[in-house]
């Protein structure tokens, strides 16, 4: 990991600068380059630019010093440790501006990674702070690593990430060799914590700051005080630095209190950090103007940073100057990461912080920077207001610092985007408290307006929101709303910009939470949002997704509604309305039934006896037969009379099979009849009768029907008297066949493949016919010859 940190984002020029700085600081390059060969982590990191010479001394340190990182003497060592970490992780970035602006971004990304791996992040805001053991690790990094850096390899520090971090940033101006060692540790911790964080450092630069917002805010406050008081090079109290955990958060701002909270861990942070946040809020309130200015600078450095410039942006690039102060300097290369680290340290989310950085970088690293930058402890609110998605995460981080779950949720949420962060913020109890001022956080979903509200209303509500969060948020509110420089302006811009970027996106998801009004109201709504997707970005997204799902059921409900209308048509359709498919089927089934009913009604209106015969008449030309039938027996009319009543009911479907049977029975009865026309009409007449019989009076009508059938058959036989004359004799058949054969041969194409078949059949048939005729002729002659003779 150490090599990875060194190699990450470090160009040859950066390495050269780092070597020079290392020489100046008396830092041993060998120690910094404990891992000369690139590690698989470097390759995995995919940092082509970071393929720095294995032992090249951490350029970030020199860069940090050059970038006006001159902090406080010993305090800057701690800060330098933080800075080196961020720089080591963002060396390429360091080149941008004294290695602070860009390095700060990269350091942020890297610092969260170190947090992710579990390197205990010192409360120094070193980018490599561990996830939860912030206090112990910070102390180790600050105290133990201090002597170690000059001679020990980066791996020697507590966590390789931390040692690397301290090695990398050895360039911090005015920082003793011990400071570089701490930087190596932190840089290593940051890189080891998450090379992914380094890769996403550019994006997560500001986002990381959100993660470290509480402590970053503290550093920012310190940096602001240093800038305002001693200036960028002004060294804040080294004493607080040594307790970096507290001092770093705010040497002059009282941020030191929040820092120990960060060290204490998520749980500790919840209780002490909130109190510390309150202290920070007070200190930050004072130093926040400075921090705000530094943040403003940072905001200049990055668009999103402006909203977040307070902490994250200041930490990130432009703010590196404001951050050049001990806290800010620490923030610059690693200050953001370090604040993130502090944030991470403050909460187990420290590890998630890399994720957060990643997520923040993806959704809105700028907003997150705002979150982190806006205020160390109070900035969380500003951050929230500024970096809606990230800012929430930051506030959540701060608030989440109060609750590790919240921070972890933020981490998850940050990867997803602003919305998740919002949900995360809501999820944590502190978040809910912070949400009031974090209306932005809650309003992350409803970004623009809620944030503005959060910036303004949320801050007083922030204090209302929760004792811990209130304190922190109170600080935030003042830095955001009243903080001079960037605080007053940047928060508004941050709110405006962040809403544009992400809050607007998620405004749909969570406008209602923000709308509730004051920050507290927003916080409470955001908490429900978090509840929906409470512990994690995914959950938040799921909660958001849940809304659309109800809408889909609504759509389904609307779809079923039409079926009820269709059901009303039939009557039992109400049951079909239950489901869309059933309704669909019901429509069609209903239509079919209606058609059948209409047909039945029409059949009932027209006499069945007349209807079927008419149909048969159309098909068969036995009109005379039917007429005779009707004339001979007026029964058809009676038949029609009984038929109409039954037809509307069962007769229609039942009559069809009966009619079919009657057709066949009629043929059997008419076996002797040659003409098919008569039986068909008779049968046609029969079906209505049978139908009528089946309808009800069928039993008594059966005999009558039989009689009628017999009469019809008789009459048909009489009528057929002329029909037998039409019967073809063999002679006629032969003539017809000859005629057909002649026609077939003449009309067929002889060239077709099957022409021979036609010719063969025609010839054979014709020959047979001719032979037949000849026999007939011979017989005729024979018959005629005797008669004349006789």
Swiss-Prot record:
GO biological process per UniProt: regulation of DNA-templated transcription; response to muscle activity
Chief site of localization: cytoplasm
Subcellular location as annotated: Cytoplasm; Nucleus
One term under GO cellular component: cytoplasm
Keyword tags: Cytoplasm, Nucleus, Transcription, Transcription regulation
Positions with biased composition (Low complexity): 40-52, 111-123, 158-169
Tissue distribution: Muscle-specific expression is increased by endurance exercise.
Region annotation Disordered: where it falls in the sequence: 38-391, 425-449, 507-545, 626-648
Disulfide bond entries: none
Bias-annotated ranges (Pro residues): 146-157, 170-179, 635-648
Polar residues bias: start-end ranges: 80-89, 98-107, 366-391, 515-532
Role played: Regulates the expression of selective PPARGC1A/B and ESRRA/B/G target genes with roles in glucose and lipid metabolism, energy transfer, contractile function, muscle mitochondrial biogenesis and oxidative capacity. Required for the efficient induction of MT-CO2, MT-CO3, COX4I1, TFB1M, TFB2M, POLRMT and SIRT3 by PPARGC1A. Positively regulates the PPARGC1A/ESRRG-induced expression of CKMT2, TNNI3 and SLC2A4 and negatively regulates the PPARGC1A/ESRRG-induced expression of PDK4.
Protein's name according to its UniProt entry: PGC-1 and ERR-induced regulator in muscle protein 1
């Amino acid at each position: 990991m150490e090599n990875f940190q060194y190699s990450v984002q470090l160009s040859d020029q950066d390495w050269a600068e780092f070597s020079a700085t290392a020489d100046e600081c008396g830092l041993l390059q060998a120690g910094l380059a404990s891992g000369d060969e690139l590690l698989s982590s470097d390759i995995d990191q995919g940092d082509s630019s970071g393929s720095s010479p294995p032992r090249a001394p951490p350029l970030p340190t020199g860069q940090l010093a050059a970038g006006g990182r001159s902090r406080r003497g010993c305090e800057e060592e701690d800060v330098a440790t933080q800075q080196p970490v961020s720089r080591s992780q963002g060396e390429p970035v360091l080149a941008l501006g004294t290695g602070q602006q860009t390095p700060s971004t990269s350091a942020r990304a890297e610092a969260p990674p170190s947090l992710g791996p579990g390197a205990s992040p010192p409360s120094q805001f070193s980018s490599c702070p561990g996830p939860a053991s912030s206090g112990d690790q910070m102390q180790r990094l600050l105290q133990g690593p201090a002597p170690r850096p000059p001679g020990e390899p980066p791996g020697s520090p507590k966590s390789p990430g931390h040692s690397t971090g301290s090695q990398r940033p050895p360039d911090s101006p005015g920082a003793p060799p011990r400071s570089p060692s701490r930087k190596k540790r932190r840089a290593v911790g940051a890189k080891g914590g998450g090379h992914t964080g380094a890769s996403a450092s550019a994006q997560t630069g500001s986002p990381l700051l959100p993660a470290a917002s509480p402590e970053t805010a503290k550093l920012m406050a310190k940096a602001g005080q240093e800038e305002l008081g001693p200036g960028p090079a002004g060294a804040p109290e080294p004493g607080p630095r040594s307790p970096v955990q507290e001092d770093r958060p705010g040497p002059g701002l009282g941020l030191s209190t929040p820092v120990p909270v960060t060290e204490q861990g998520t749980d500790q942070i919840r209780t002490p950090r909130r109190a510390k946040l309150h202290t920070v809020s007070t200190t930050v309130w004072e130093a926040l103007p400075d921090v705000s200015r530094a943040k403003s600078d940072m905001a200049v450095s990055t668009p999103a940073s402006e909203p977040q410039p307070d902490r994250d942006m200041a930490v990130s690039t432009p703010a590196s100057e404001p951050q050049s102060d001990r806290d800010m300097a620490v923030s610059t290369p690693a200050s953001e990461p370090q604040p993130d680290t502090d944030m991470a340290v403050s909460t187990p989310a420290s590890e998630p912080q890399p994720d957060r950085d990643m997520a923040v970088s993806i959704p809105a690293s700028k907003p997150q920077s705002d979150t982190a930058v806006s205020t160390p402890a109070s900035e969380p609110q500003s951050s929230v207001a500024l970096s809606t998605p990230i800012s929430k995460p930051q506030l959540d981080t701060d608030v989440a610092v109060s609750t590790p779950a919240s921070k972890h949720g933020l981490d998850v949420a940050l990867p997803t985007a602003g919305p998740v962060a919002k949900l995360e913020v809501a999820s944590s109890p502190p978040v809910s408290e912070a949400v009031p001022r974090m209306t932005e956080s809650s309003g992350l979903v409803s970004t623009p307006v809620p944030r503005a509200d959060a910036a303004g209303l949320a801050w007083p509500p922030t204090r209302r929101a929760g004792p811990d969060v209130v304190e922190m948020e109170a600080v935030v509110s003042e830095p955001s709303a009243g903080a001079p420089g960037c605080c007053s302006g940047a928060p508004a811009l941050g709110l405006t910009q962040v809403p544009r970027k992400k809050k607007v996106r998620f405004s749909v998801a969570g406008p209602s939470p923000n709308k509730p009004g004051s920050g507290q109201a927003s916080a409470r709504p955001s908490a429900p949002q978090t509840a929906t997707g409470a512990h994690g970005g995914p959950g938040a997204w799921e909660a958001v997704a849940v809304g659309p799902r109800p809408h889909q059921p609504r759509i389904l409900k609307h779809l079923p509604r039409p079926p009820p209308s269709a059901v009303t048509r039939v009557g039992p359709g109400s049951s079909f309305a239950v489901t869309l498919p059933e309704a669909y089927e019901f429509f069609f089934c209903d239509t079919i039934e209606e058609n059948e009913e209409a047909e039945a009604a029409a059949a009932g209106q027209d006499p069945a006896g007349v209807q079927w015969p008419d149909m048969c008449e159309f098909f068969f030309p036995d009109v005379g037969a039917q007429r005779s039938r009707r004339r001979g027996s007026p029964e058809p009319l009676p038949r029609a009379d009984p038929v109409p009543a039954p037809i509307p009911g069962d007769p229609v479907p039942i009559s069809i099979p009966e009619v079919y049977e009657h057709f066949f029975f009629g043929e059997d009865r008419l076996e002797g009849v040659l003409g098919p026309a008569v039986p068909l009409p008779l049968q046609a007449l029969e079906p209505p009768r049978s139908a009528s019989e089946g309808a009800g009076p069928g039993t008594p009508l059966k005999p009558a029907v039989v009689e009628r059938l017999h009469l019809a058959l008789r009459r048909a036989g009489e009528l057929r008297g002329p029909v037998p004359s039409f019967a073809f004799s063999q002679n006629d058949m032969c003539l017809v066949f000859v005629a057909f054969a002649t026609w077939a041969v003449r009309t067929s194409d002889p060239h077709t493949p099957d022409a021979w078949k036609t010719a063969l059949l025609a010839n054979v048939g014709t020959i047979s016919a001719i032979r037949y005729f000849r026999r007939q002729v011979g017989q005729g002659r024979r018959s005629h010859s005797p008669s004349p003779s006789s």
